[in-house]
Amino acid sequence: RAMALVLAAKGAKLALIDLNQEKLDESAQLCIDAGGEGKGYVANIAKEAEVEQVFNNIIADFGQVDVLVNNAGIIRDSMMIKVRDGEITKRMSMAEWQSVIDVNLTGVFLCGREAATKMIEKGNQGVIINISSISKAGNIGQSNYSAAKAGVAAMAVTWAKELARFGIRSAAIAPGFIATEMVASMKPEVLENICKGVPLNRMGEPAEIGKAVAYIVESDYFTGRVIEMDGGLRL
């Protein structure tokens, strides 16, 4: 939502996709209040037919797609193999693996493919931005998530090479620890330890990721790169 509001404040017309109609309506109104336009669309981005239909609906309402921000994502954290007292007690299930891959990787591919299709069909230039994560470098307990986030970063670079001839740019952003609702629910001592590991000594704000999105959108010569927004965590 923070990314949408940053763009709305610049007057953007926003098509918002989610599974929750109530949250979509709320976000759309906030975008309008911020100075832009907003309309919500319910769709499961892991399903090809739903992605194709929702982009058709967006074209019908807005005429064209100029920017796609691939931000949908879930986590199903688990060790690949968990061992206790020399005994294997759990393995990451195929359900845990596949659910994350379906949304975080396949969903990004489907939306990217559909957005590029519409841009080429309409003859308009555009930009596709994939939200990756610093977990793309590998993180304990996140085989599924790390694989997906590495994949979407690589896809952004691949698409930049494939789509440049159409005037379509592609890039990715890899956030570090961001003060989302999920992170804010952690114990205070855990949050303190996280911040100690960040050179800037704090977590990032969602709006700061939104500013990075706006930078990519507004920078016509920027493509094929992954911006790491992590407060210097990986220095």
Predicted features along the sequence, with ranges:
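The beta1-alpha1 cofactor-binding region of Rossmann-like NAD(H)/NADP(H)-dependent oxidoreductases
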Residues: 21-22, 42-54, 94, 208
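Catalytic loop of short-chain dehydrogenase/reductase
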Residues: 88-96, 129-151, 156-165, 178
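C-terminal substrate-recognition "lid" of short-chain dehydrogenase/reductases
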Residues: 202-229, 234
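Conserved mid-core segment of classical short-chain dehydrogenase/reductases
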Residues: 75-98, 121, 141-144, 184-186
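A short, exposed helix-loop element centered on a Lys and neighboring polar residues
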Residues: 112-113, 157
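Canonical Rossmann dinucleotide-binding motif of NAD(H)/NADP(H)-dependent dehydrogenases/reductases
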Residues: 1-15
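Active-site loop of short-chain dehydrogenase/reductase
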Residues: 9, 36-37, 64-65, 119-133, ...
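Catalytic Tyr-X3-Lys loop
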Residues: 66, 74, 87-109, 129, ...
